[in-house]
Amino acid sequence: MAAVQMDPELAKRLFFEGATVVILNMPKGTEFGIDYNSWEVGPKFRGVKMIPPGIHFLHYSSVDKANPKEVGPRMGFFLSLHQRGLTVLRWSTLREEVDLSPAPESEVEAMRANLQELDQFLGPYPYATLKKWISLTNFISEATVEKLQPENRQICAFSDVLPVLSMKHTKDRVGQNLPRCGIECKSYQEGLARLPEMKPRAGTEIRFSELPTQMFPEGATPAEITKHSMDLSYALETVLNKQFPSSPQDVLGELQFAFVCFLLGNVYEAFEHWKRLLNLLCRSEAAMMKHHTLYINLISILYHQLGEIPADFFVDIVSQDNFLTSTLQVFFSSACSIAVDATLRKKAEKFQAHLTKKFRWDFAAEPEDCAPVVVELPEGIEMG
């Protein structure tokens, strides 16, 4: 880890007040990082010191000893660190990952008594990126992490999956109407159909809130279905009441958690959840009137998140549609209206101007959502 220039008095205070994470036996050459910083581990590396208290994301990629250029998928985990706290972890050679099992208290205390001698093997937390990290995680609480992280706490760029059915024998394939192994595929689609259905290994999946696929209540009339398909407030309130009953603001913590898992953990499923959750928030006009503080904070979150991703990242390769501009276009048409809270309206107008100037995105055109909406009615309901 490269040396960081820091005022001696500040360094002394941080050494005694900051948290320390010790990671024993991490192999030389491993790509290791904390929050917005990453390094290649050297032979003397034992961890990170002077870490500010709060939520942090530690991530790493193992390296093939025979071919150091071969880097494994990124893995990571969240830690909630406290003032003067000491966390002791170990590298598992067998699993090639950090073992998150808590170290015995006696070992932790022995390590604490030896911190002065261990200091030379600990890299200092890079404070230059602390403000950026806080801006991306200020709504992620310890409770958010406990709720969303996988049961095994390891967040992996590639899902650990298993087949839904083992199908070890030919009779198992016949039972699923699948052709015998060895029979040549006649088309690409047939080849896809032969692939086994997969599911995440138990305990490895990020536990995101389930988002509704039906945006209207049971028994809704055709007019109500159309209304709830244009304004998703009913669906959003369903999520807030079920998942965040005591504090609707906590949905913003989940939005940030998903973004960090994608940005730093390289988890594509987290990006897809971020898009779906953002779409639900941005297309809920009635909810903006009720939860204006939540939406004021949402704008601040998006301001910092969008600064981390290239402008063309959200453009669909096939259709060339930009998910973000179309979603925010609907958001601004509601948030900039006279009916909403004045503070929210002013902040939305400033944010819109900022995005237009920075990314040259056009929010002036009428959004497609203003066109007539075609909705599929539930079975048994007919238009009057």
From Swiss-Prot:
One of its GO terms (cellular component) is spliceosomal complex. GO terms for biological process: spliceosomal tri-snRNP complex assembly. Pfam families: AAR2 (PF05282), AAR2_1st (PF20981). The modification N-acetylalanine is found at residue 2. InterPro entries: AAR2, AAR2_C, AAR2_C_sf, Aar2_N, AAR2_N_sf. Component of the U5 snRNP complex that is required for spliceosome assembly and for pre-mRNA splicing. This is Protein AAR2 homolog. It comes from Homo sapiens.
